Curated annotation (Swiss-Prot):
Virion surface side of membrane: 19-47, 99-112
Keywords: Glycoprotein, Host Golgi apparatus, Host membrane, Membrane, Transmembrane, Transmembrane helix, Viral envelope protein, Viral matrix protein, Virion
Gene: M
GO molecular function, one term: structural constituent of virion
Organism per entry: Canine coronavirus (strain Insavc-1) (CCoV)
Function: Component of the viral envelope that plays a central role in virus morphogenesis and assembly via its interactions with other viral proteins.
The protein's name in its UniProt record: Membrane protein
Assembly, per entry: Homomultimer. Interacts with envelope E protein in the budding compartment of the host cell, which is located between endoplasmic reticulum and the Golgi complex. Forms a complex with HE and S proteins. Interacts with nucleocapsid N protein. This interaction probably participates in RNA packaging into the virus.
Superkingdom classification of source: Viruses
Residues covered by region (Interaction with N protein): 237-252
An example Gene Ontology CC term for this record: host cell Golgi membrane
Amino acid sequence: MKKILFLLACAIACVYGERYCAMTESSTSCRNSTAGNCASCFETGDLIWHLANWNFSWSVILIIFITVLQYGRPQFSWFVCGIKMLIMWLLWPIVLALTIFNAYLEYRVSRYVMFGFSVAGATVTFILWIMYFVRSIQLYRRTKSWWSFNPETSAILCVSALGRSYVLPLEGVPTGVTLTLLSGNLCAEGFKIAGGMNIDNLPKYVMVALPVRTIVYTLVGKKLKASSATGWAYYVKSKAGDYSTDARTDNLSEHEKLLHMV
């Protein structure tokens, strides 16, 4: 495997440059040589030298990164999901700081073309960051849920039952919503969102909140077994508008609760 890696390094290395020997006692030593054996020495610059000495460390970091991206979902692990959210939050300020710093360095050495690219990158990053906050705040106004600030959340399912509001982040707007009741546990999209419920506690409508509007889903069918508190209820889109999912419950009819505006 090492031979293959060294040959690959030879293929992608620059023709002109220092020959860094990977077979010497010191991994950081280099020598000027005309040896043509790519298995012992390879043509390289700083990038290939870095990969040759830090490839294991980078492989471990990338494995962790892939694991976080692949399994950073609530259905797998809430802990990994939290790490993924933290990484995504930190990427915006880190990228913005790097582009600003690079723009400063390029301006100091009078490389104005690269300075322009750096300024453009910083501007785009800042605009995208502001757009994220605007959409998150709009979604939070409708749902009062901190899931609104998850960068991957584009919609939030809101279910009112037993005098409480339950929320579940979604990646998109569903055509229909199915609530499943299993031995008194209310589940949506495969997640348990409430417990200790019976068939009389199922809501007549549920809502899916987006940053710009709220979609109301009305109950159209259900099949329940009262003896075991088990069954399902299906909801379809009925209307959309500037509704709040956190409707007041004092002295309001069901229709007034539904039409309670933000």
